[in-house]
């Protein structure tokens, strides 16, 4: 450690880590926090990136200051490119908060194929653990909705059994457009289970109809649950009235 580090200056990993406390200082004037952000922006260190990421975990008043600071931090981290990837992913693993900022950064920094891989890997990790706050799962499931990759559907499937209804609905929304055959049975079981909440049932109905799946083996139970405009046709396919057929645009 150099003399500058001892007296509050310098660009060491230890100094970068200590500045996290100032970056996450919610109360008082913004000057100390903004100075710390500027100092960290000048440090080309993974520890500096980690401390900058912590700024996304707090909200300050006024809202305009909060937004301006977060966008400034976003730009500082994004400019680091590849060097920021591992600190961002570590932050995402360790924090339930601010996952939307982390995913936005990864989307901007990574090539498309590596971004999909990151989404898949983080979803696989989350599918194996209980989380009190579902925010991170919801953010990643929302990202999965728009990704066209064969790994997405099997990775999302386990979330149909999550404890949180919001997570189940997020998984259904991601699975619906994928028409993943292995999802048919789990979605039908979820729909017809007596303990399933009504809003989850609604999500399941929409997902099954979007996938174009049949309800064979569950027809009687499914029909008893269907609201308008959904129905089961003669072939046993769950459909929405007025929806375009296969190969037709909406």
Residue map of PLM features:
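Amphipathic alpha-helical scaffolding segments comprising HEAT/armadillo-like alpha-solenoid repeats
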Residues: 9-24, 45-61, 81-93, 112-127, ...
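Short inter-helical turns and helix N-cap capping residues of alpha-solenoid HEAT/ARM repeat scaffolds
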Residues: 28-29, 60, 65-66, 94-99, ...
């Amino acid at each position: 450690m150099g003399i500058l580090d001892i007296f509050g200056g310098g660009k060491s990993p230890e100094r970068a880590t200590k500045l996290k406390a100032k970056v996450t200082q919610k109360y008082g004037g913004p000057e100390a926090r903004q100075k710390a952000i500027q100092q960290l922006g000048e440090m080309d260190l993974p520890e500096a990136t980690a401390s900058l990421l912590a700024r996304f975990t707090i909200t300050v008043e006024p809202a305009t200051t909060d937004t301006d600071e977060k966008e400034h931090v976003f730009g500082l981290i994004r400019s680091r490119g590849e060097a920021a990837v591992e600190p961002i992913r570590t932050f995402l693993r360790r924090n339930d908060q601010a996952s939307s900022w982390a995913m936005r950064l990864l989307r901007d920094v990574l090539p498309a194929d590596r971004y999909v891989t990151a989404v898949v890997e983080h979803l696989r990790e989350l599918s194996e653990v209980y989380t009190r706050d579902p925010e991170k799962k919801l953010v990643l499931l929302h990202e999965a909705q728009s990704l066209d990759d064969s790994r997405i559907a099997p990775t999302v499937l386990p979330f149909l059994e999550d404890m949180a209804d919001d997570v189940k609905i997020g998984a259904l929304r991601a699975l619906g457009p994928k028409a993943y055959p292995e999802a048919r049975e789990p979605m039908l079981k979820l729909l017809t289970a007596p303990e399933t909440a009504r809003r989850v049932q609604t999500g399941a109905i929409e997902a099954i109809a979007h996938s174009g799946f049949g309800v064979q083996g569950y027809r009687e139970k499914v029909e008893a649950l269907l609201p308008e405009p959904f129905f089961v046709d003669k072939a046993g396919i769950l459909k929405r009235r007025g929806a375009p057929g296969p190969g037709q645009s909406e």
